[in-house]
A protein has these predicted regions:
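Conserved GNAT-fold acetyl-CoA-binding loop/helix
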Residues: 20-47
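Acetyl-CoA-dependent GNAT
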Residues: 38-85, 89-95, 107, 112, ...
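Conserved catalytic-core motifs of GNAT/GCN5-like acyltransferases
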Residues: 72, 124-126, 141, 145-164, ...
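A short, internal acetyl-CoA/4′-phosphopantetheine-binding micro-motif in the GNAT/acyltransferase core
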Residues: 89-98, 125-130
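Conserved acetyl-CoA-binding loop-helix of GNAT-fold acetyltransferases
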Residues: 98-115, 137-142
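Conserved GNAT acetyl-CoA-binding A-motif
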Residues: 113-136
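C-terminal "cap" of GNAT-fold acetyltransferases
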Residues: 157-205
């Protein structure tokens, strides 16, 4: 089997400038992110560090070292009973879309989540205001359906951006049958490093 055109690895704080440049268009020119302002570099570094304390924060890197996108899981709701759930986030460079990268990111995220004893993944997805919405399409909704997520609810007109209201759709994917007595969630940094490396390698193929 030939080597993949990119590899997955864990994000570092040094990746923050490149990742912020990937994220910025989704803030400034789209309603995919509901942030109004692009966060500062220091704030973005803080987010990477905070998420990485418990969850995987992944980047995709091509053969030239250019970052193509990033993905992570993070806290769903900050109460102990929700610990076996996580919310997923993926952002791709604009020219890296439509090449199967998002699907491979989810392949990695799902397997790493199971290794952590996380069984439910949730995605929070903005809904476009009709087919002619220049700030948002239904691509993310259709992508998550393709990945096995099921739409379970909608927050009606809960987001206001670019002078219009947006619905926020929630989608869910159950990764396995829930055990009657689940093992505690394992913080991502405590996972076996060889296992993580193997998952990242296989997911990029």
């Amino acid at each position: 089997m030939s080597s993949p055109a990119f590899r997955f690895r864990l994000a570092t704080l040094d990746d923050a400038p490149a990742l912020l440049s990937i994220y910025a268009p989704y803030v400034e020119k789209a309603a995919i992110s509901f942030e109004y302002d692009v966060p500062s570099l220091d704030e973005f570094r803080r987010r990477i560090a905070d998420i990485s304390r418990k969850y995987p924060y992944l980047v995709a890197e091509d053969e030239n070292g250019q970052l193509l996108g990033y993905a992570y899981t993070h806290t769903f709701i900050a109460r102990e009973a929700y610990d076996h759930c996580a919310e997923s986030t993926i952002y791709l460079a604009l020219d890296a879309r439509k090449h199967g990268l998002g699907k491979r990111f989810y392949r990695a995220i799902e397997e790493l989540s199971l290794a952590q004893n996380i069984y439910n993944l949730y995605a929070c997805i903005g809904e476009p205001q009709g087919a002619d919405d220049e700030y948002l399409t239904d691509n993310s909704i259709r992508f998550h359906e393709h990945m096995g997520f099921r739409r379970i609810g909608v927050f009606t007109r809960s987001g206001y951006k670019f002078g219009r209201w947006y619905n926020m759709s929630w989608a869910e994917k159950l990764l396995m049958e829930h055990p009657e007595h689940p093992e505690p969630v394992i913080p991502f940094p405590q996972l076996d490093k060889a296992l993580v490396a193997d998952i990242l390698r296989r997911s990029a193929e």
